[in-house]
Amino acid sequence: MSDIALTVSILALVAVVGLFIGNVKFRGIGLGIGGVLFGGIIVGHFVSQAGMTLSSDMLHVIQEFGLILFVYTIGIQVGPGFFASLRVSGLRLNLFAVLIVIIGGLVTAILHKLFDIPLPVVLGIFSGAVTNTPALGAGQQILRDLGTPMEMVDQMGMSYAMAYPFGICGILFTMWMLRVIFRVNVETEAQQHESSRTNGGALIRTINIRVENPNLHDLAIKDVPILNGDKIICSRLKREETLKVPSPDTIIQLGDLLHLVGQPADLHNAQLVIGQEVDTSLSTKGTDLRVERVVVTNENVLGKRIRDLHFKERYDVVISRLNRAGVELVASGDISLQFGDILNLVGRPSAIDAVANVLGNAQQKLQQVQMLPVFIGIGLGVLLGSIPVFVPGFPAALKLGLAGGPLIMALILGRIGSIGKLYWFMPPSANLALRELGIVLFLSVVGLKSGGDFVNTLVNGEGLSWIGYGALITAVPLITVGILARMLAKMNYLTMCGMLAGSMTDPPALAFANNLHPTSGAAALSYATVYPLVMFLRIITPQLLAVLFWSIG
């Protein structure tokens, strides 16, 4: 058997063994995709014992390409919500998550200096302790750029594997410990979170208002500033028993009922100007109007603003709201449409059908993957990651590398959505498949390279001390920030658990947090809020630590 055939066969065996290990769960908790790393270590141990020779060049290419696939698909997935997560609504959560990253870096630096841990080993421990695989890839690349011998670079994968299990268990222990310390009632926390969401300013809500202001009588909607702006959509108007879709030229009369969509603060301002909220239903049932959700798939409307499509004027149809990557938005006229946007349309059936034809509404297109944008994005990401940034006094130029470059480029392209007929939307199933393939390839190679010396290091070497160092890097930041968030910021417990899981980019921890109260979305929401920024910082941190440690000796 040729070296290439043998290498591919061994990698397939590693994937099978590793995925099996990852699927084994104890009380609902398992290693997940991290099992592939240990599958690689097991197979790598026996490969080393048998004296087999694998193609090192091929392993290196597979490892790097797997990492690129993984981080690129993550960026495409979270890109649409990344910049929104940095705004005020998620600022507090992101600050606490960043604090966890900073404290983890400080603990790593202290351990490195106190115990004189070799640089590749301490970076591997750091990456494993925070259960972040792209950090491992970024650290290995910067070490190679600094001229570290390959046998030392491979030690990083071994120390990563030592620290990884407690990285997963440590965050679960922290959640449990904080629950005990603060005597948390999970049901109460879930109710408080739901109440805050209802009263908060981030959700899109609807209300029905009666026109009671005599100054508005006989005015057109376009002449009422609060109704003609971008913060509120008036999607229905009821006069006596007639329900209609209002256009900008529709005349308002006293006693009219308006169905408004917007954020709570803006709707409150509308009440002050127009009139009081009423309980009267403005449902389309029993009328010639209907409400329908339509998905944007027509390439000809991508990038166009809603106001430029003139749906109100041409079809008497109102877009009441827009869902983009799971986030509900007010469908203001200045929003540019992206592939996969889901629009709520209100109008007559024939008019809605006409608008749906303009927008595309081809569900099958959502399952198709445009491969050209994928490779354009990967290519641009690799180029971005290869740009050196020279910092005075540093022995090597800083680079985003093959982990950071594709991630940043994917975040940008995911936010842009489309350029001409090229769109970077990727069906969730396709995104997940590419992401899992990438991480399996990467971890398989890392495990194989570490497996030869793993058992000897654990039994006869410094493996146990590495595990202890990793436990400190995991536990100290999580416990410190968890206590601060609860005591000083009075953060909701479920929200805090999601933030802690997101700060470690740890899906098993998110699964545990979600199971604390299965019907509450608090943990998932905070996890998604901090995940993009933390993923970026986790990739950059080992590079900064490597250069700093290297420069100060």
UniProtKB/Swiss-Prot annotation:
The gene is yidE. InterPro entries: AAE_transporter, RCK_C, RCK_C_sf, Transpt_YidE_put, YidE_YbjL. This is Putative transport protein YidE. GO terms for biological process: potassium ion transport. The chain crosses the membrane at residues 4-24, 28-48, 65-85, 95-115, 158-178, 371-391, 393-413, 439-459, 464-484, 493-513, 533-553. It is found in: Cell membrane. Signal peptide: none annotated. PROSITE patterns: RCK_C. HAMAP family: YidE (MF_01016). Residues 191-276, 279-361 form the RCK C-terminal domain. Its main location: membrane. It comes from Escherichia coli O9:H4 (strain HS). PANTHER family: K(+)_H(+) ANTIPORTER SUBUNIT KHTT, TRANSPORT PROTEIN YIDE-RELATED. One of its GO terms (molecular function) is monoatomic cation transmembrane transporter activity. GO terms for cellular component: plasma membrane. The keyword Transmembrane helix applies. Keywords: Cell membrane, Membrane, Repeat, Transmembrane, Transmembrane helix, Transport. Belongs to the AAE transporter (TC 2.A.81) family. YidE subfamily. It is a multi-pass membrane protein.
